[in-house]
């Protein structure tokens, strides 16, 4: 390549460290346009997108009239997603969101790309989902995945700093942890097994061994739902903490979510710019305390305001729908904890309220801007006899849950935990409209390809 064998190869994201230098970058052509003696290539390399400028007179000067002209014409006709090794000088570009560009002095085609299906024109969602393996290359999807990666990194950082141990819960289980019928069943050497809906029960066992633990893995729900908030396969972060009250758990939940937002703001400003996310709102969620209200308060508020708002009437004892959650969180303008739900609509393992028989000690965290529940948590029931009764009441097998009941027989202590849905958190922090774009290859009702 023009004899420049000793030129350093860098990544686009590191352009700010090489302004004025001649470097090489292995990239793909995301888009291009040309006019007369100049061509503009939008380049991507997996770390970022930026512009490469090709000026015909520079190629003629470097390679001669005939070779330079031929090379320039070849570049003008390169197709979308052609893989290239480009050499050039990094320059600042105040007009772009990224802030830098390259004056290209040489280009070598590494891999051809013919008839790339996702063109710069508009495509329908089904078409893009059928080509998800290619759609991931687009600037928006790339930005969302960078934020997702940052949230995962920040999750490990937060819990490591807080003294948690990560444990791995099984994906195949012999029982339904939540006592639900929304299960994917498979054959396990002649006996039924299920894809796990939660790692929580195993995390509780871990908390009794290590004090503070968290699980992080895929979970599965056979929900026949087509809403913008639901996937059939998604990832959950589920901490459990021994000798921890629910109020203490709420403090940890708030600190954790704020840590995620702060980390994205600090380390992923470029993706947020690409996504045009309102970072002033994210800053607000970090700086202001989260709101805490009871389920009773929420029902009273919804009933009081229903005449002036577009959501269905709700009675005490009913669970909230998406419009209810949207109104509540927007009413307060910050992430909002709703505490102490009726026990009839919550899971069997939650601790009963000390002064009320009709509610349990729990909370859901509702994200603002219509993003809904992103965390569910509770203090766990610790009394063996009570939990045994709840297992029977929910129609669960005492034999299958005997190991879980054992945790209440051998040194039972107050403990609390929660679960955060990774994709819901990604959708909220990126300001995206649909959860399907918050995971590389979404699994939804009628969607298992690619």
From Swiss-Prot:
Q: Read off the SUPFAM superfamilies from this record.
A: Class II aaRS and biotin synthetases, Nucleic acid-binding proteins
* SS bond partners: none
Q: Name one GO molecular function term.
A: ATP binding
Major location, coarse class?
A: cytoplasm
Gene Ontology process terms (BP): asparaginyl-tRNA aminoacylation
This entry carries the following GO cellular component terms, namely: cytoplasm
Q: Which CDD domains match?
A: AsnRS_cyto_like_N, AsxRS_core
Concerning InterPro entries, the annotation shows: Aa-tRNA-synt_II, aa-tRNA-synth_II, aa-tRNA-synth_II/BPL/LPL, Asn-tRNA-ligase, Asp/Asn-tRNA-synth_IIb, NA-bd_OB-fold, NA-bd_OB_tRNA
Q: Which PROSITE patterns match?
A: AA_TRNA_LIGASE_II
Q: Which reaction does it catalyse?
A: tRNA(Asn) + L-asparagine + ATP = L-asparaginyl-tRNA(Asn) + AMP + diphosphate + H(+)
Q: Does the keyword Plastid apply?
A: no
Query: Which HAMAP family would you find in this protein's record?
Result: Asn_tRNA_synth
Q: Which family does it belong to?
A: Belongs to the class-II aminoacyl-tRNA synthetase family.
Query: How the protein assembles, per its UniProt entry?
Result: Homodimer.
Name of this protein: Asparagine--tRNA ligase
Organism name = Enterococcus faecalis (strain ATCC 700802 / V583)
